[in-house]
Structure formats: C-alpha cells, structure tokens
Amino acid sequence: MKRRTDPECTAPIKKQKKRVAELALSLSSTSDDEPPSSVSHGAKASTTSLSGSDSETEGKQHSSDSFDDAFKADSLVEGTSSRYSMYNSVSQKLMAKMGFREGEGLGKYSQGRKDIVEASSQKGRRGLGLTLRGFDQELNVDWRDEPEPSACEQVSWFPECTTEIPDTQEMSDWMVVGKRKMIIEDETEFCGEELLHSVLQCKSVFDVLDGEEMRRARTRANPYEMIRGVFFLNRAAMKMANMDFVFDRMFTNPRDSYGKPLVKDREAELLYFADVCAGPGGFSEYVLWRKKWHAKGFGMTLKGPNDFKLEDFYSASSELFEPYYGEGGIDGDGDITRPENISAFRNFVLDNTDRKGVHFLMADGGFSVEGQENLQEILSKQLLLCQFLMALSIVRTGGHFICKTFDLFTPFSVGLVYLLYCCFERVCLFKPITSRPANSERYVVCKGLKVGIDDVRDYLFAVNIKLNQLRNTDSDVNLVVPLEVIKGDHEFTDYMIRSNESHCSLQIKALAKIHAFVQDTTLSEPRQAEIRKECLRLWGIPDQARVAPSSSDPKSKFFELIQGTEIDIFSYKPTLLTSKTLEKIRPVFDYRCMVSGSEQKFLIGLGKSQIYTWDGRQSDRWIKLDLKTELPRDTLLSVEIVHELKGEGKAQRKISAIHILDVLVLNGTDVREQHFNQRIQLAEKFVKAVSKPSRPDMNPIRVKEVYRLEEMEKIFVRLEMKIIKGSSGTPKLSYTGRDDRHFVPMGLYIVRTVNEPWTMGFSKSFKKKFFYNKKTKDSTFDLPADSIAPFHICYYGRLFWEWGDGIRVHDSQKPQDQDKLSKEDVLSFIQMHRA
C-alpha cells in the first residue's frame, strides 16, 4: 500500500534542498587557487548547522551523518570539477557515500590512492607489469596502404639469358675464399641500404616478443592464413598447389615448347619427380594427390625427427614415393651437403629413370636459426648451393626446378642464382600468397634445363667440397661468381635489385602490421574465410577436412570396386586347349598369350601391406598375402604368385613374386573397359610407380610378358632345362623372363582381345592389320570402340594350354603323348591361319 505524501511535510524538505543547492553553487564558484581541503571543510561545517535547524522545524529526527552523505553526493554530482564529469551521477554518489573528497584518498586518514586506476594494458600471458623494451616503440611504418588481398598473382621472370653457359676454363678462378663473414648489414650491392636496414630493424623488434604472442597476431594479420593445409599433411602442400597453378601446372603437367603435354595418363611414361630436403613430405603428397599412380617420386632428406612421414599421407598413396638417403641407400643419413650422398642419389635416380633424370625437382630446405634470424641467408648458404647442385645433377634436359630461398643480399647467393639463370631457359623469384608475407621466404622457379650444363654442375660440386673443408674454420667461400661478371649483365642485376627491394618493402609492411596487431588485440583481417574459399576454388582443391583413410575389410572393398558386376564372372575357369578347342582360335590375330607359373588369383590392395588374395569361388574367403610388398589402396588385380629362381645348384636363390595377368582397378581408377593391350601397358606403368629398387628385401611385382599368338615361337626360345634346387638333380623345364629370373612353367594362357562380331585380318595390299565386322561386313584400319574386349570378356573367354606330363614343348623333354596337343600341332595351326 502506497503512503500518501503530505504537502505540508514536503515543504520544509524542498526549502532545505534549495538552500543546499545555493551553497553548492557558491562552492563550485570557488577560485582554482583555493586549496580543495578548505572548500571541503567549509562545506561540512555549513551543512552541519543547517541540518540541525531543519530537523527541529520538521519535528522529525534526522542524523547529521545521513544528511552529510546526501549533501556530499549532491555536491559531487553538481559541484565537482570537470575531472570527474565523465562519471555518471550514480557512481559519483557511491563514491561520496564512501567518504570520497576530491584530491584526497579514501580512509580514516585519507591515506588511500588519490589518482584514478588506469585501464589494464596487460597483453596475453605476459607477467603483470612486464613491458618489453624496444617492442612497444612505434615503427613509423604505414601498413594500412597494403594492396587488397586477392587470389590472383602475377609472375615476373628474369629476362632470357643471352650469354653462353660458362665452361670449366672460364670458371677456374671464380671461386673466392676469404675471411668468414657473419654480418649482413653491409650487403648493399643488390639492395638499397635504407631498405636493408629497415627490414633488419623491423625483424629485430620481435626478438623480445614471446613466440606465441607473435604467432597469434600473425594469424590475425595475414589475410591468407586460413588456407592452411586443407586435407594435406602440412601447409607446404598448399604452397606447392598454389605455385603449380600460378605456373600453369608446369610441374604436374609439363609441356614442351609447343604446348604439347610431355606425359599423358593413358601413355606408358610416368611423371618422375624428386623431393629433397623436404621432410615430412607435403610437396610430394600434393603431387601424388594430383597425379595418383601416374607419377613416381624419389626423396632425400635428413634422417631424424624431420624425416619423411609417409604414414601421414592421407590424401595420396605413399607407396608411389621412394625415399633414398644417399650413400647407404635406405640406411644413409640423407645429409645433402655430403658429396657422397649427392653422387649416390644422382646415380639412383638416373638408374631408375632410364638415365634421363626427373621431370622436375622440388627443394624446400631450411633449419632453425632461432636468435640469428637476420643471418639466415649466411647460415643457409651451403644448403642453398647443394639444392641447386642437385637440380643440375638429376633434372632431365627440359625439366624444371623449384627451390625455397631466403634473403638474397650476399654476392654468394646472387652468384648461385646467376648460374641457374645461365643453365635454365627461364628463371624467376616468386613469393606465393601461401608464404607468410612477414618472412624472408621466396622460391626460385626454373623452367627448361638447357643442354651442356655439366661444367657448371662439376664446378658447384667442387665448391661444396671446399665448403666442407673450410667448415669450423675462420675461412669461407665468399664468391662463386665474380661481382663484375654478375653486374656485367645489367638486366639480371636490375631484376635482382628490384626483386630484393620489392620483397623488403613487403616484409617491412607485414612486420609493421603484425606489430600493430600485437599492440591491439581487437584488430583482425575480415576477409580470411572469403579469400580461402576463392583460392581453393581457383587452385582446384576441394574444401575438405583432413581425415585418416577409413579402414575396410577386403570383401567389402571388393564389392565397392566392382560396382555391381556379377560376381559369378570371377569364378569362371579357363577352357582347356585341346585339338577340338584349338579350332576356335581363328583368326589368330585376335589373341594374345602369356606363360603361367601358378594358379590364377584375384588380389586386392587396401594400402601399404594390407594385401589379400581370393581364388574366385564365392565359398572361399579373402586371405592375407604373406609377402613383403606394398600396394596403393583401391587396387584390384588378376595375378599369380610365382616362385622365381635365380642361378643354379647350391647358389640358386628363390623368391616369391606377384605376376600380373590383368588389371581391373588401379589405385581407384577402373580400367576394365579399356583394351587388353592398354590394360597391360597401364599395369607396367603402375608397377614402375610402386616398385622399390632400394628395397631388395621386398617381394617384387611384375607384369606378365604378353606375346601375340602368331609369334608364339618366341616363347619356346625362352624355354630351357635347368636343375632346380631340391629336385634330386633332375633338370626341369624353365622359362626365363626379361629380368633373368626363371620359373617352372605350368602352361600357356591364350586371351581373346577382340570383341564379337569384330575380328582382325591382315591386308596383303597395305601390309598391315585391319578390323572386320562379321555382321555388317565393314572393315577399317582404325580401332572401333565396340571391338574392344573388356576385362570380363577376356577373362570369360580365355583358354589354357596345360604343359603337364605328356606335353613336349622342349627338345630335351620326354616324348610327346600322341593323345595330347603338341607344340608342333599348335605352331602349324598358327602358321596355317595367319597367312
């Protein structure tokens, strides 16, 4: 229930407030020279006497303290100086109730703090009160005028080199050895002094800053930061994806000078690449994701914690990549600065690329220079040289090279770039948007290795030997190309200076931006998500999360790969070749044949050593293959497990090998509908990609040698009688393959590769084969699409000529059983029907 206000009672109160207001007005007009304390005490005395008279008039008891508080609150609101005018009346009244007087502290003796408590300037996890001397100063760099972030990038190439590639005689006195130099501030030959000192100063500012605080600010400041690694192993993979796109896929789809692709997925040649100083392997994971089993990689990196992490290749098949660590092979140390390792890796790569070398080399070397960031270029000079040397050692003529560099201020580093400029058709220095703008990282990109670079390679090899000799001494190689030679090429020098100064300007702005973002934690780049989406779309990278490949049992994976095909097909057994069935092999040009060494099986690869076999009967299960080998996931093959032999007598060695008869799915690529010849060609390409010459402990994988039926006599030339270990000294029939290993043959598979109603004939007029349709009577020299026999037709219609007892296919064997098909019978039939 509300209490009614009595007008007579409220009148004295209004009168009292009027008097207080008048007094407050007089106090507020007090001179600024008058001490605040006298004003306060005067006010207090006046209010005390005033409150006493008013309480008697009202006839109601009021304590002097309560009125004193009310007066002080009102005086704070209306009569205090402008120093406190920013605070609202409520907060001022609260302070007044606690006894606050302007210019005095709280407490009985006014001993409290007199000044206002400042807002906290605490940053991150720094200790309370910690200030970083040197960091909190202003950099005086305007970073806000940086260009708008964009996914589009421009490439600026060095002008084409018109001078001859230097030879041994010319380079004989180029190497200059002098006192070891450990300062960078005076390296102004290829960069303006002011810019150089500015970038070094900006870097030095961050020396006192906590690393985590720096990283958080950098993450907010970089508009491209959210690109990260997507579904790859690390950010390096996305750098390669970025640069591969910018350079028109010159790495994953190299072309000749006429724009024609050098390698095609449907052709036999692999795309060979190498990855050095590259652990854990992000560059290679990207290339293998893009090319799948159409590429083969070789890698060398330092053994240890930064080794290749092939088990973490989630998006690509690491079985297509072969690490080799130089001298000692898989047991080497991978140190690229050791001449023995460079030579060993070069020989290994050439031996496994038909002596041609790789199509391109990627090098991403670097090591921690914590506390010496400004000297990174000097500390990394030998690493840079060895990566350049490796390019000239293993890249094929016309091939490409990409390598990470840091600052390029010293004449030593610029001299190395000059040698690349002489040895490649085109060279450029490029910083991708996936490389953080504040660091000194850049990439030298080289296109089209020239002929005749051997002398430069030998020269760099000699320089590396000298660097190793001078290690831990006060001397060093200071020049690899004389300054007058470099500066004599004005176009090269101008590009080098422009590139360095442009890079310095970019770094300075980026460092200043991070500095500002450290100081103000509310700053952020608003378009990070938008830019990320735009970049992934442009580079052709799906926006997917990184997840480990799901595990699967072989049976489920088999049904997934055959995609609804009738499973009964896989239980078909070949038709035995007899005198009666021999008549069906007409014309002979429709058929191919292969030597059998054991029973046919289906083999499925689920990744790494997860390999299973199945004999085709629905009642039987998939069985784990007890061999040491690896295959990419999503692979389905028709194979034999053959016991191969090498040598004779007691020294004879036996090894189990996988022989491929036909292929269905290769690393997720369904090839069943392609021509048999094409499937065999792709199988050979696949085997090259997965083979591991550096691992003699692994069981080999081979593709059966396929013969035209009309050339069957070539098979019998490869047959001979050999003594098999454990066969009581009795010679047995052996077939020797292309790799000089032999096995005991069980018979011959004969496969029809032309689909009905098409058949093949031989034109005597044109001296070549043609295709003939038995229904339409059409004939053509070009392969008709509907004449191709897919896998299930080839598998269902195959024949098998068993070479058991009573079959004489070699002159040293026992006499022929007259009731069985002889070698002569078959050869005479072929001769009769191929004319």
Swiss-Prot record:
Residues 87-133 form the G-patch domain. Substrate binds at residues 203-207, 218, 374-376, 439. A motif (Bipartite nuclear localization signal) lies at residues 2-19. Changing residue 239 to A: Abolishes catalytic activity. GO terms for molecular function: mRNA (nucleoside-2'-O-)-methyltransferase activity; nucleic acid binding. S-adenosyl-L-methionine binds at residues 234, 277-283, 335-336. Residues 57-67 have a biased composition (Basic and acidic residues). S-adenosyl-L-methionine-dependent methyltransferase that mediates mRNA cap1 2'-O-ribose methylation to the 5'-cap structure of mRNAs. Methylates the ribose of the first nucleotide of a m(7)GpppG-capped mRNA and small nuclear RNA (snRNA) to produce m(7)GpppRm (cap1). Displays a preference for cap0 transcripts. Cap1 modification is linked to higher levels of translation. May be involved in the interferon response pathway. Interacts with POLR2A (via C-terminus). This is Cap-specific mRNA (nucleoside-2'-O-)-methyltransferase 1. It comes from Homo sapiens.
